[in-house]
């Protein structure tokens, strides 16, 4: 019988994000918005749009629309990079700070609840296996 591990992992990510999405409804952020804000916040300051798109795992044109919406909401600013006038740097605004705090809080508390009843050793084993799978995939992509 063929392994369904890939489908199982994809489903896990989908339901995990859906739960966070549901809990963040009061903030009126779409999943795309909160994932983007979360990644901007955890990356080094003033990342380029290209670097952010890579971190999120989406194409840059898809990201631009989301950034336009976040800029309209006053949550980010974008400015031209001094070294490369074609590149745009992204910065969180002060207005985004309380929202980022809430998003981060929901993500952390949800993670804690989801992982409840699973030992730290089990989590470490799972993380190690996921790392190995990712390395295998990256190696296969470079062949």
From Swiss-Prot:
Coiled coil: none annotated. SMART domains: HTH_MARR (SM00347). One of its GO terms (cellular component) is protein-DNA complex. SUPFAM superfamilies: Winged helix' DNA-binding domain. Residues 49-72 bind DNA. Pfam families: MarR. Keywords: Activator, DNA-binding, Repressor, Transcription, Transcription regulation. Residues 2-135 form the HTH marR-type domain. One of its GO terms (biological process) is positive regulation of DNA-templated transcription. GO terms for molecular function: DNA-binding transcription activator activity; DNA-binding transcription repressor activity; transcription cis-regulatory region binding. NCBIfam families: PRK03573.1 (NF002926). Belongs to the SlyA family. Homodimer. Transcription regulator that can specifically activate or repress expression of target genes. HAMAP family: HTH_type_SlyA. This is Transcriptional regulator SlyA. The lineage of its organism: Bacteria, Pseudomonadati, Pseudomonadota, Gammaproteobacteria, Enterobacterales.
């Amino acid at each position: 019988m063929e392994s369904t591990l890939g489908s199982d992992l994809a489903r896990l990510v989908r339901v995990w994000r859906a739960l966070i999405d549901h809990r963040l409804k009061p903030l009126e952020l779409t999943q795309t918005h909160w994932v983007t804000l979360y990644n901007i916040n955890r990356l080094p300051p003033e990342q380029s749009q290209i670097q952010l798109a890579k971190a999120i795992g989406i194409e840059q044109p898809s990201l631009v629309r989301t950034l336009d919406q976040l800029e309209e909401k006053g949550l980010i600013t974008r400015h031209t990079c001094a070294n490369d006038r074609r590149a745009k740097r992204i910065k969180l605004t002060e207005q985004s700070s309380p929202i980022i705090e809430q998003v981060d809080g929901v993500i952390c508390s949800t993670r804690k609840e989801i992982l409840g009843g699973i030992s730290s050793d089990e989590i470490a084993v799972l993380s190690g296996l996921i790392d190995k799978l990712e390395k295998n995939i990256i190696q296969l992509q470079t062949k």
